[in-house]
C-alpha cells in the first residue's frame, strides 16, 4: 500500500463526511453535558489540567463548561498539543458518521494496538465521549481539522453518483492494472494528502482512450475529479479504497526513534556541564555588572541596539549569540528590565542584587529555571533578512518555546546516560509530538535549544547531564513564568524583605558538579590576583571594580593597572579601604609594586575623605533623575496548568451548580479582627494548608457581611476564593477585609 505523511491543515470542512454506509449500529452516548456530569472528580481534574482555558474564568455550571469545551479555539488548542498518532485518529473520527464504535474505528486502522491510548487521550481532553459501543466527537472537530482531515478530500458521491461504482476494490484494481506509466506516482502525491493536484496542461474532456497523461487517465476513470481549470482532487470515497485496511500511514502510531551518535562517559559529561554552568553564571554577573555602570539604551521597539549587543559579546569574550542568550535569560529571570524614564535604559533590577548574594549553585538554578520556561528565542536575533531582529525585542518571543524545550528534555531523558543523540532524528521526534505546529519553527527551536542547553550547563559533550535530567524531571512542578515574574516584581518593590526561590532539585543536581566558592585570592608581583576556584560573589564584584578580568573558568585572573585603580578611587573607594580588602582576602602579602602604584594614584588625585552620606540613601542625589525599573510583561507559554486550590474550587463550584438547593455551611464563630499586615500571611498560610476561612467583608453598599470562603490565591491586592454563599469563585479586595479566621463549618447545617 502506498504510504506518506499526513498534512495537518485547518479550514472549512464539507458537510458530508462519511463515504461509506454504516455497517454497525452504535449506542447513543448522549450529550457532552451529560457525560461531564457523570465524570468523577479525578476525571474532571484531569480535563481542567489538560485544558486550562476552561477555568479562566471558572464556568458557572456544567452546561457552560461543555459549551466552552466545544468551541473552535479550545479544541484547536487541544489538538495542537497532541502527537501525530492521536491527531490522526481524531481526524479519522471527523470523517465518520456518529455515533461510532471502537470496533468500527479499529477496523479502519488495521486493529492498531495504540488505538486505546488515542481514545483515552481524546476522552480525557473532552474531544470525544461515550463508551466503546457508542462515541461522539464535539461537532466543531470537523471544522478544526478541515479542509483535509487525515489528508482526505471531500466526498463527491452526491455530485458524482458514478463514484459508487468506481470506489470498490475490484474496480480500482482494474483501473490500476490497465493504467499507463506514471499513474502510481500521481496517486502517491495525493493519497495521504493534500488530495489536490495542480496540473498546467489538462484536457478536462479527455476520455480513457484519448488521455495523454496519467492525470487525464485517472480523471477519465473517475479516480480524480476536476475541481478547477487546472485542479484535480482525489475523492474521499476513492481514497478510502486506495488506503485499504489502514486509513493512516503504517508507522504513524510509532514514536520516531532517536539513534545514538556517540556514547560519552557520564562523568565527563557532568564535568563539562558543570564547567559550562559555572561559566554561564560568571558571564551573567559580569555583563549585568557592566550594564549597571553603563546601561544600554532601550530601542523604540523595546529591544537592544546591535552595537550594544556587539559590545556585550566583547565584554564576555564570546560571540553575539551567547551575548543574546545572556541578555534574554536575564530578562526572563527578572534580573534585567527597562526603566521608566523618558529615555529608557536596560538596567539590572534589585532582584539581581539579591541573586548575586546566593550561592553559585542557587544562582545557576535561577538561570536554568528561567531558561526552561522562557518564551524568548535568542537564536532569532539578527535572523530576519528584511528587518533585523534585535535582542530583547518582541520579535524574539515565541510562546511555543517552553513546550518545545519540555519535549526536547523529555526525549533526551529517555536516552541512556552519556548518549549524544542524532540531531536530525531528535528534530523528527519532536515534530511527531506536535504535528500541527509549524515544522520549520520546530526545527529551528530544537536545534537552537539543544545548543543553548550546552551553554547553560544542562548538557556536556553533546549529551544530557545530571543537571539537564533534573530540568526535564521538574518541568511540571517548577514555578510558572507568571509566578517567577511576580517574584521578581516583589523583589523590585521590596528588595530587603524578598527572597528569590529556586528549585532545590536543580540546586542539588548542580552542586556536585561545581567546586565550592572561595573567598580568597593570591596577589602576584606582576599586578595580578589569581583565584584558584569560583570566587564568592562579593569578592568577584570587588575585584572587577579594582581590576580587569583576564581569564575565566575554574581559576580566574584579574589584572590591576593605573586605569583600573583610578576608576575605583573615582567611584568612592579610598586607599585604606582597598588595602584592607587586599589584606583580608589575599592569602599572600601585598606586593610592593601594587602598593606603590596605589600610593602614586592617591597623590595624583588628592586626598579625599569618604564619609557616610547624611542624606537618606534612598533619595536621589541633587540633579539626579530617579529611575524606576519596570519588568516588561512577557507572554506566558500557552496553557499553564491551573494550581491545585483553583482546580479544587472549580470542581466544587461545578458540582454545587448542579445542586442549587444545597445548604450553605453554617459558620461556627465570627471572624476575628485582623490588621492589614497580618492578613496576607494569614491567608497565604490558609491556602497552603488548604483551610476554609471566614472573612468579614465590606460590600460595595457599605454593609459588612461574613463570608465563608475557600482561599485560592492572594495576588494584586485581591483574594481569589470560592464563595460558599454565591457558589462561585470570586475576587475580594484585601482592603475591604477587616477580619478573618480559620473556619470549621457544621456539615449539612447540623
Stretch-by-stretch model annotation:
Residues 100, 197, 707-709, 732:
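A broad, structural micro-motif
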Residues 133, 229-230, 341-343, 527, ...:
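Beta-strand-connecting loop/turn residues
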Residues 697-702, 723-726:
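Short acidic, glycine-rich loop/turn motifs
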Residues 267-278, 282-284, 360, 367-694, ...:
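Extended alpha-helical interface modules used as scaffolds for assembling large macromolecular complexes
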Residues 2, 6-437, 597:
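Short, amphipathic alpha-helical interface elements at domain boundaries
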Residues 136, 233, 694, 718-720:
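General beta-strand recognition
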Residues 709-715, 721, 727-729:
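Low-complexity, glycine/alanine/valine/leucine- and proline-rich hydrophobic stretches
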Residues 728-737:
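A short macromolecule-binding patch
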Amino acid at each position: 500500500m502506498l504510504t506518506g505523511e499526513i498534512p495537518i491543515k485547518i479550514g472549512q470542512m464539507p458537510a458530508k463526511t462519511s463515504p461509506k454506509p454504516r455497517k454497525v449500529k452504535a449506542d447513543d452516548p448522549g450529550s457532552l453535558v451529560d457525560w461531564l456530569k457523570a465524570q468523577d472528580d479525578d476525571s474532571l481534574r484531569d480535563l481542567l489540567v489538560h485544558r486550562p482555558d476552561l477555568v479562566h474564568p471558572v464556568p458557572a455550571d456544567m452546561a457552560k463548561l461543555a459549551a466552552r469545551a466545544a468551541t473552535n479555539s479550545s479544541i484547536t488548542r487541544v489538538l495542537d498539543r497532541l502527537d501525530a498518532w492521536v491527531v490522526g485518529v481524531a481526524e479519522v473520527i471527523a470523517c465518520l458518521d456518529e455515533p461510532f464504535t471502537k470496533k468500527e474505528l479499529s477496523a479502519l486502522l488495521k486493529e492498531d494496538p495504540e488505538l486505546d491510548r488515542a481514545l483515552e487521550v481524546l476522552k480525557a481532553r473532552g474531544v470525544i465521549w461515550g463508551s466503546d459501543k457508542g462515541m461522539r466527537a464535539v461537532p466543531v472537530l470537523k471544522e478544526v481539522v478541515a479542509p483535509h482531515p487525515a489528508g482526505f478530500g471531500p466526498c463527491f458521491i452526491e455530485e458524482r453518483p458514478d463514484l459508487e461504482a468506481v470506489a470498490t476494490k475490484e474496480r480500482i484494481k482494474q483501473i490500476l492494472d490497465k493504467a499507463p506509466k506514471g499513474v502510481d506516482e500521481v496517486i502517491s502525491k495525493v493519497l495521504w494528502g493534500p488530495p489536490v493536484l495542480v496540473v498546467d496542461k489538462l484536457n478536462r474532456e479527455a476520455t480513457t482512450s484519448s488521455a495523454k497523461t496519467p492525470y487525464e487517465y485517472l480523471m477519465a476513470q473517475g479516480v480524480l475529479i476536476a475541481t478547477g481549470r487546472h485542479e484535480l482532487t482525489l475523492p474521499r470515497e476513492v481514497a478510502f479504497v486506495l488506503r485499504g485496511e489502514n486509513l493512516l500511514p503504517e508507522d504513524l502510531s510509532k514514536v520516531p526513534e532517536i539513534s545514538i551518535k556517540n556514547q560519552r562517559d557520564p562523568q565527563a559529561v557532568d564535568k563539562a556541564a558543570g564547567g559550562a554552568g559555572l561559566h554561564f553564571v560568571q558571564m551573567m554577573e559580569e555583563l549585568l555588572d557592566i550594564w549597571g555602570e553603563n546601561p544600554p539604551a532601550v530601542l523604540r521597539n523595546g529591544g537592544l541596539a546591535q552595537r550594544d549587543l556587539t559590545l556585550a559579546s566583547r565584554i564576555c569574550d564570546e560571540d553575539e549569540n551567547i551575548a543574546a542568550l545572556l541578555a534574554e535569560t536575564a530578562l526572563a529571570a527578572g534580573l534585567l528590565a527597562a526603566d521608566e524614564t523618558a529615555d529608557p535604559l536596560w538596567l539590572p533590577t534589585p532582584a539581581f542584587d539579591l541573586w548575586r548574594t546566593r550561592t553559585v549553585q542557587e544562582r545557576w538554578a535561577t538561570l536554568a529555571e528561567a531558561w526552561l520556561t522562557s518564551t524568548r528565542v535568542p537564536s532569532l536575533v539578527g535572523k530576519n533578512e528584511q528587518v533585523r531582529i534585535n535582542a530583547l525585542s518582541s520579535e524574539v518571543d515565541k510562546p511555543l518555546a517552553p513546550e518545545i524545550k519540555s519535549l526536547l528534555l523529555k526525549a533526551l531523558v529517555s536516552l541512556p546516560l552519556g548518549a549524544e543523540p542524532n540531531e536530525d532524528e531528535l528534530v523528527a521526534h519532536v515534530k511527531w509530538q506536535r504535528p500541527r505546529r509549524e515544522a520549520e519553527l520546530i526545527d529551528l527551536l530544537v536545534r537552537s535549544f539543544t545548543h543553548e542547553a550546552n551553554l547553560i550547563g544542562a548538557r556536556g559533550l553533546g549529551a544530557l547531564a545530571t543537571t539537564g535530567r533534573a530540568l526535564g524531571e521538574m518541568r511540571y512542578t517548577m514555578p510558572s513564568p507568571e509566578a517567577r515574574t511576580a517574584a521578581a516584581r516583589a523583589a523590585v518593590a521590596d528588595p530587603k524583605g524578598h527572597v528569590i526561590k529556586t528549585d532545590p532539585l536543580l540546586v542539588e543536581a548542580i552542586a556536585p558538579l561545581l567546586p565550592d566558592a572561595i573567598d580568597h585570592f593570591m596577589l602576584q608581583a606582576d599586578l595580578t590576583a589569581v583565584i584558584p576556584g569560583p570566587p564568592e560573589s562579593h569578592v568577584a564584584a570587588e575585584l572587577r571594580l579594582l581590576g580587569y578580568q583576564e581569564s575565566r573558568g575554574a581559576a580566574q585572573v584579574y589584572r590591576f593597572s593605573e586605569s583600573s585603580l583610578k576608576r575605583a578611587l573615582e567611584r568612592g573607594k579610598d586607599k585604606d579601604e582597598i588595602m584592607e580588602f587586599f589584606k583580608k582576602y589575599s592569602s599572600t602579602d601585598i606586593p610592593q609594586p601594587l602598593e606603590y602604584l596605589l600610593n602614586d594614584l592617591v597623590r595624583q588625585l588628592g586626598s579625599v575623605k569618604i564619609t557616610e552620606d547624611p542624606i537618606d540613601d534612598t533619595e536621589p542625589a541633587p540633579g539626579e533623575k530617579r529611575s524606576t525599573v519596570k519588568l516588561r510583561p512577557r507572554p506566558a507559554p500557552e496553557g499553564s496548568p491551573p494550581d491545585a486550590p483553583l482546580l479544587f474550587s472549580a470542581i466544587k463550584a461545578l458540582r454545587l451548580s448542579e445542586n442549587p438547593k444545597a445548604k450553605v455551611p453554617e459558620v461556627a464563630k465570627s471572624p476575628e479582627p485582623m490588621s492589614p499586615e497580618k492578613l496576607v500571611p494569614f491567608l497565604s498560610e490558609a491556602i497552603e494548608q488548604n483551610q476554609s476561612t471566614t472573612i468579614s467583608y465590606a460590600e460595595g453598599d457599605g454593609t459588612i457581611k461574613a463570608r465563608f470562603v475557600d482561599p485560592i490565591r492572594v495576588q494584586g491586592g485581591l483574594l481569589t476564593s470560592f464563595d460558599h454563599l454565591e457558589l462561585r469563585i470570586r475576587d475580594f479586595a484585601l482592603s475591604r477585609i477587616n477580619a478573618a479566621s480559620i473556619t470549621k463549618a457544621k456539615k449539612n447545617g447540623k
